[in-house]
Regions:
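Aliphatic-rich helical/repeat scaffold segments used for oligomerization and domain docking
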Residues: 1-177
């Protein structure tokens, strides 16, 4: 809270298909900037903020994001931006932090829920499913399927999140089949 006293704003860009909607999506995260807010209006709004802006899943919108972010940062603000993307934005001052694959379950060990709970890829999968399916947890019944899925997805966080998002519609066993 001390680092970002004005809060953390998360803008999920995976659902934005029109590059022209990037500014609107970011404006929505900052109260006081109405729909159709321009980059200049956004920059004015964030000029005095000590906040973190997270732009999630922006690989399909690299160009408009790469135009907007420097404008926001140049506003004299203490705004910080964290962009998640499979490719760099290519803007001055950008720091690239690769996210390596997570540890996956050992295929030669039985799928014991207690042992699997400590595996980071399994923990991510279960956490993401539980966010969409209240009460979902790692059990003896689903442990083998979850272990297999995480191993098949090579521990890649994005792949695990995308698979977990399909569980409400398909179920774990069907997804693993």
């Amino acid at each position: 809270r001390r680092t970002f006293p004005d809060g953390v704003r998360v803008v999920e860009l995976s659902g934005v298909t029109d590059p022209g909607q990037v500014e609107q999506a970011v404006a929505h995260a900052f109260a006081g900037v109405g729909p159709g807010g321009t980059a200049a209006a956004l920059a004015a709004r964030v000029a005095d903020l000590r906040a973190l802006l997270i732009l999630d899943t922006c690989e399909h919108l690299v160009d408009p994001v790469a135009l907007l972010v420097p404008t926001l940062l140049a506003a004299g603000s203490r705004l910080r931006v964290l962009a998640t993307s499979r490719q760099p934005l290519g803007i001055p001052g950008e720091r690239i932090v690769p996210v390596p694959p997570m540890r996956v379950p050992d295929p030669d060990r039985p799928a014991d829920p207690a042992a699997l709970a400590g595996c980071e890829s399994v923990a991510l999968f279960v956490d993401r499913v539980a966010a969409a399916v209240p009460g979902f947890r790692l059990t003896r019944e689903n442990a083998a399927a979850i272990a297999e899925l995480c191993a098949r997805l090579d521990g890649i966080p994005l792949a695990i999140e995308l698979a977990a998002a399909r569980v409400p519609a398909l179920g774990v066993a069907r997804l693993a089949a």
